Each structure stands twice: as C-alpha cells, then as structure tokens.
A protein has these predicted regions:
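Conserved active-site "lid/cap" helical segment
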Residues: 1-88, 96, 162-174, 195-201, ...
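Condensing-enzyme catalytic core mediating Claisen C-C bond formation in acyl metabolism
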Residues: 1-24, 138, 149, 168, ...
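Conserved catalytic cysteine-centered active-site region
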Residues: 2-4, 18, 55-107, 115, ...
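Acidic, glycine-rich active-site loops and adjacent beta-strand->loop/helix elements
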Residues: 12-15, 51-56, 85-89, 112-119, ...
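Beta-strand segments within the central parallel beta-sheet cores of soluble alpha/beta enzyme folds
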Residues: 42-52, 79-85, 107-112, 176-182, ...
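Short glycine/threonine-rich loop-to-helix capping motif typified by GTGT followed
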Residues: 56-64, 256-260, 288-311, 339-341, ...
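Active-site-proximal alpha-helical scaffold in enzymes
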Residues: 84-114, 156-190, 230-236, 336-359
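Extended C-terminal subregions enriched in glycine
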Residues: 269-292, 300-303, 333-339
Length: 395
C-alpha cells in the first residue's frame, strides 16, 4: 500500500486499433512518447518495470521480454524488471514502479505491452487461460463447456455466469448491460487511441452474435494489440498542472473468497488507505472485460449501491457529462481495448489525460480525482490480483 504522492511525469500510448506492429515496435513507441512528454533522458532512469502476459506463447519470448523488446530503444544499461500478472500486469507494474519512484533518485519507467493478434486464435485463447491455475482449467472446461459456446472461451463462460448472477441478485437487465456497451463504444469513438472507432445502439448490441449465454459480441472486450507507458518520479519533480498517483493498494486472492467479494474487500482497504471514500471520485477506469462486469464491479466496489449501477447506466448518469460518476471515459476494455499487460497502465494514462486537461472531445470537465481498478487471473472463483490506484490533479 502507498499514500505518498508520486508524480506522473509523462505518459505514452499506442493506437490500439492497429494489428500490424510487433511488440518491440509498440514498446518503443510508448516508451519514447512517455519520455518525451516527461522531458526525461534515458540515462536519468533508475529502473524500468515491464509488463506482458502472452509473449511466451505468442511471441516466442518466454523470459526477459522487457530486455529483449527494449534492447534497441536507447535506454542504456538501466535495470529492467519484468512483471507477468495476467490482465493485471500493467497495474502490478505501476504499483511496483510507484513504490520505487518514491524512494529512488531517478525517474522510473513503467511499460505494458501486448501482442494478441497473431493469426492463431486458439493460441491466444490458451494464453488467456494461463490466468487460471493449471489444475483448475479442466474443471472450468467441464463446467462452462466452451465448445458449446460460439465464443469458445471458458473465461467468457465464467463472465456469463457472473452476468447472470448480477441479473438474478441485483436486478440488472440485459438492456442495462447493452447500455453500458453503447456508452463504452461511444466514448471509444471519441478516443483517437481506441480500438473501437464506431458508436452503436442498444438494438445493435442486443442483435450482435452470441458469445456466451446472455453476452453478445458487442458487450465483450476483444483481442487487442497495444502498449502504454508512464514515467514516474518524486512529487517535487512534477510540472505545473501535472497528475499524481496518490494511493495504490493491491491484494491477491487465494481461492477463499468470491471474486466480487474480493473486489469489495480491496476497495474498502483502499478507502482506508487513501483517506477518502467512493463518493469522492470524479471518474473511474475499471476492468470491464464485459459490459455486465462493468455494472457488477461498480456495485461490488461500493461506487454504487446494490442494484443501482444498471439503472444509472441506462439513464446516462455514468456517461461523460452525466449526472454521476463518469465510468470508463476511454471506452474501457470493451471500447479502448484490452491488451492484457498494458491495460492497467492505459487506465492510469487515461486518468492523467483528463486531469491534465488533455481529453479533447471526451474531456471529463472539472475532474480532480480519478480511480483505476484492474484485476488479473482467477483462483478457484477468487480474483488472483486486484489493484486500485487513486490519481489526482496537481494543485
């Protein structure tokens, strides 16, 4: 856990609608953009923390991925530490990077990069399933029978189970889930770095092909290539009008708690650590692997009351310029995209973009405090990792 502010000196991110770039090319682009934004020279860096999930399976690089993909980036001999934490690799890297930046003499570079489009869909799905314990996968296959679902994914089967749980326990409707997808894709259509470039309607979401159970294709995140980077440093190096990571809390599940209960437990620890509550935030970037999960997570985190997130979404309250908390102004995983190891960093980049007044047509006006929530992996129904960052505007 951390509470001392860490300055976000610079940010960088690739266009997540592209599929034609290598992991190395994307890493270089995000890194040099972040360094340029920060005005930091490579020789000033004290550490690089690099996150990736699927490089072993999809890029034939089982180890030393950060060193391999950055060896021609001109960073010299700065130490590179690699992080692999499934969908939460970038969030984990930011957590580690913020801890180091607080104590280090030089800035810390945090990078997340993922290459998911390789032409081998089965290999990508298998890599995603590595986010489950090996001795748990057979049980998951037997339970969710991916061969019987159009999407062919046990994790989308699990997400359908959660969607139905949210509908049965909280009164969420399929129209409310579709409304979350519409919001995500509209926000993404105004985000020049997003995977999705076209807005949609509730009817189009509901009519799109089935993935698993109640979930349709337009309600779900999809494979994404992308990279995102942060340059972090001590608060006294922050430029005027900058943004700061003012809190970071992380928890790992061990199979003893329900996934959404783990979200709630981690959120309560975050509020205590941050010294603020769920009502203090202007915007949140969260892990919407599906649009149903957006609604379920909002309530599990305590950002909305039981059964309230779905109606608020349908009413437009969570939209940019809506009456309430702005949810996933980037478009989230469903709209911006979900390049696993880069997702958590992309969330923080998005919050910093708004806090620095750089959001363009999707700017969350007057935002002063944002929340980034990301998860990775599933341990017997529990979240393997939950990471929460609070990001604030400078004074």
């Amino acid at each position: 856990m951390s509470t001392e502010p860490v300055a976000i000196l610079g940010t960088g991110m690739t266009d997540m609608s592209r599929r034609d770039q290598s992991a190395e090319t994307m890493a270089h682009q995000a890194v040099h953009e972040a360094l340029g934004d920060a005005g930091v020279e490579p020789h000033e860096l004290s550490l690089v923390v690099a996150a990736n999930a699927l490089g072993g399976r999809l890029c034939e690089q089982g180890c030393i991925r950060g060193q391999t993909w950055l060896r021609k980036a001109g960073l010299g001999d700065v130490a590179v530490v690699n992080v692999d934490n499934s969908c939460a690799g970038g969030t984990s890297a930011a957590h580690v990077g913020s801890l180091v930046a607080r104590a280090s003499a030089g800035p810390v570079l945090v990078l997340g990069v993922e290459k998911m489009w390789t032409g081998d869909r089965a290999a990508t799905l298998a890599g995603i399933e590595d986010g489950l314990p090996a001795d748990y996968r057979a049980d998951m296959h037997a339970r969710f029978r991916p061969e019987e679902n159009p999407g062919g994914s046990i994790l989308m089967g699990l997400n359908d189970f959660w969607a139905r749980q949210c509908m049965n326990d909280r009164g969420t409707t399929v129209e409310q889930i579709a409304a979350a997808a519409v919001k995500a894709r509209y926000n993404a259509s105004r985000n020049p770095m997003a995977q999705i470039t076209k807005a949609t309607t509730i009817d189009e979401v509901l009519a799109s092909p089935q993935v698993a159970g109640v979930l349709t294709r337009l309600m779900c995140s999809s494979f994404t290539d992308g990279a995102a980077a942060l340059v972090l440093g001590p608060a006294d190096r922050a430029p005027a009008g900058g943004a700061f990571i003012v809190g970071s809390v992380a928890r790992s599940g061990n199979g003893e708690m329900d996934y959404h209960d783990r979200l709630g437990e981690t959120a309560r620890a975050a509020w205590e650590t941050f010294g603020c509550g769920p009502g203090d935030f202007d915007m949140v970037e969260l892990h919407d692997a599906t649009s149903a999960e957006e609604i379920y997570a909002l309530e599990s985190l305590g950002l909305f009351g039981h059964g309230e997130a779905g109606p608020a979404t349908l009413a437009g309250d969570t939209a940019i310029g809506g009456r309430g908390l702005t949810v996933n102004p980037s478009g989230g995983l469903v709209g911006r995209g979900h390049p696993l190891g880069a997702t958590g960093i992309a969330q923080i980049v998005e919050l910093a973009t708004h806090l620095r007044g750089r959001g363009g047509t999707r700017q969350v006006e007057g935002a002063r405090l944002g929340l980034a929530v990301n998860t990775g992996g599933v341990i017997e129904g529990d979240a393997a990792y939950v990471g929460i960052h609070a990001v604030a505007a400078g004074r």
